[in-house]
């Protein structure tokens, strides 16, 4: 893998559902991004349903990114995502305003 690929910014756009049924699919996408990029942008604007597994997936992703010195930022977050993160006490850990 070239240095150019390592310095590009990756984008992940979530569909309307981020729950246990989608966790394995997103785990693969997120893991690939960690291997390929130094900066990742997440678009969670379309999320209409998220459960504990979805929040755990995001939390694990943020922790893995931190250990690999990969920067993550949100392009957008849906109200559902914001409320779920707030209720679970994860807004800080998930860098959600």
Range-by-range predicted roles:
Residues 1-50, 60-97:
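STAS-like cytosolic regulatory interaction modules
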């Amino acid at each position: 893998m070239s240095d150019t690929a390592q310095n590009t910014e990756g984008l992940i756009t979530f569909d309307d559902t981020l729950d246990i049924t989608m966790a394995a699919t997103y785990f693969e996408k997120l893991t690939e991004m960690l291997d390929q990029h130094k900066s990742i942008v997440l678009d969670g604007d379309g999320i209409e349903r998220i459960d504990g597994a979805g929040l755990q997936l995001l939390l694990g992703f943020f922790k893995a990114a931190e250990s690999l010195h990969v920067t993550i930022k949100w392009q957008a977050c849906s109200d559902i995502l914001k409320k779920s993160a707030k209720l679970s006490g994860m807004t800080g850990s998930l860098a959600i305003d």
